[in-house]
Every structure is written in C-alpha cells, then in structure tokens.
Design a protein with these regions (language model features):
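Conserved NTP-donor binding/palm subdomain of two-metal-ion nucleotidyltransferases/polymerases, i.e.
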Residues: 135-255
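N-terminal subdomain of nucleotide-sugar transferases
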Residues: 1-39
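Helix-loop-beta element that forms the nucleotide-linked donor phosphate-binding surface
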Residues: 104-123
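Short beta-strand->alpha-helix junction loop in the catalytic core
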Residues: 119-128, 134
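A conserved, positively charged/aromatic
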Residues: 66, 79-94
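Short N-terminal targeting/anchoring amphipathic segment
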Residues: 39-57, 70-74, 187
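A short beta-strand/loop micro-motif in the catalytic core of glycosyltransferases
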Residues: 93-101, 117
C-alpha cells in the first residue's frame, strides 16, 4: 500500500463535523505503518471517506468508480434509515465502517451486499485509543484493497472467459494485459505486473494468429500493439515474442 487519500465530507451538523475532523486528525497523527495520508494525490491506492452528506463526497465516489479506485466509508451515523430518502449505492467491494453497535446493525440491514465492520470511534468512546483505531483501520485498508483487487481480477477473468478460448496461455496473457490496462488507468503500473506479462509472453507456446483473432474480438488490437512497445521499453519483451506488430506507444489504454 502506497498512498491513502483521506476525504472529509462537509457535514451539516456542527457537532458531527467536529467529530469527523477530530477523527481524521487523530488518524493522521497516529500515522500507522505503511499508510501515507495524502489529500492531494488524484490517484491514490485507496480512499477513506469520513462522513457522507455533501455533493463533493458524492462526486468523489463517482470519480473513484470511474477510475476503479476502491474506497471505504465511515458514515458517522449519516446513513440512518431516516436520513435519506434515496440512499447512496456502494459497489459490493466497498467496506462500511460503523462506529457503534446500533449503527452496525442498521448498516448491515441497509447494505446486505457490503461488508460492514464495527470499529469504535475514539472521539466519543474511551474504550478505544487513536493508536488502536489507526492500527485497526490499517487492517481494514488491507482488507479493502484485497477485496477490490479480487473483484477486478474476477471481472477480467469473466471478460476473457466469454471468448470460450481453450488455450490457457492465450487466456493468461489476455488477463494479464487487461490488468496492466487497469493499473494504467489508475496511474500506478507495478513493475512486477509488467515483468510478469513480459516473462509469460516470452515463455509461453501459443498460436500467434489465434491470439490476434482473440485481440480483435476483444477490440484490443491497437491497444495491445502499443502495450507491446511499452513492455519493450519498460520490461524485457523483445520483438520476437510479440504476437502482433507493435505500434508506437501513444499512452496506451486497454478498456
């Protein structure tokens, strides 16, 4: 985990806003290991939304959805059954963090498809310290990232699976290429992801003509040709192991 963007919603009630601000500041001050709190990074690994009532928060969630950036939500009781005529929708991988047993039970009923966790709020409870809260949230962050990554990989596997292709090597390369595309949209391509794909393309024995057909079916021919150039520039792939002719890299994207 590299960077966590912590967003503070502008709640209407002064008391709730004070609680949210105090909670956010305490979380930053605790500085749990492996977590870098940045509010200016437009492409974080994870977004933690504290409070949930203003338009800016809704826009933040919409942008996260478009870029497939995972986020967790600590509503601070802003999702009570009587506070919303239209409750916000959260992707199934989104984790909701309740601050009390009552809120936990209510969120579990309102969002049965989401994971709901109970983590005490050190601002209003002496039963948990800010250090303990930060350590617990670090575990929640790791869980959220793992859940989101599994969902992304499952979506990719389903997309490739619809081809009905039986060649395992072709399917593996397509899945890895689409995952590189996902990381590219997130502005966070891991070198290990590139190296693994380059190594797979170099070692695999597959029908290059069939691969070209599958790329055409997925409408990935142009993007994959640019990805080949990207792999040659940033990893170990060489021309002899490219199934189609490489094109100059013009900031490739794989939908």
């Amino acid at each position: 985990m590299d960077k966590i963007l912590l967003h503070l919603a502008s709640l209407q009630a002064i008391q709730e806003r004070t609680i949210a601000e105090t909670l956010v500041q305490g979380l930053r001050d605790a500085q749990p290991a492996d977590v870098d709190y940045q509010t200016s990074n437009p492409y974080p690994d994870l977004i933690h939304i504290v409070g949930l009532s203003d338009r800016a928060t809704q826009q933040l969630m919409s942008r996260a959805g478009r870029l497939r950036i995972p986020y967790i939500v600590t509503p601070l009781s802003s999702l009570q059954p009587w506070t919303h005529t239209r409750r916000p929708h959260f992707p199934p991988a989104t984790i909701l963090v309740a601050s009390s047993q009552l809120e936990y039970e209510q969120l579990a009923k309102l969002y049965p498809e989401n994971t709901v966790l109970l983590v005490g709020n050190p601002v209003v409870s002496a039963a948990i310290t800010f250090d303990d809260y930060a350590r617990r949230m670090q575990e929640v962050y790791a869980e959220a990232l793992a859940s989101h990554d599994a969902a992304v990989r499952d979506d990719i596997a389903q997309r490739v699976g619809k081809l009905g292709e039986e060649d395992a090597a072709i399917c593996d390369i397509l899945r890895q290429a689409l995952y590189v595309g996902y990381e590219h949209r997130r502005h966070h391509i891991q070198q290990t992801t590139l190296d693994r794909l380059a190594a797979t393309m170099t070692a695999a024995n597959y029908d290059e003509a069939l691969m070209a057909d599958r790329l055409e079916e997925l409408q990935l021919t142009s993007s994959f040709a640019q990805l080949e150039t990207f792999l040659a520039d940033h990893s170990t792939l060489t021309e002899g192991f490219m199934p189609i002719e490489a094109h100059p890299n013009k900031n490739f994207t794989l939908p």
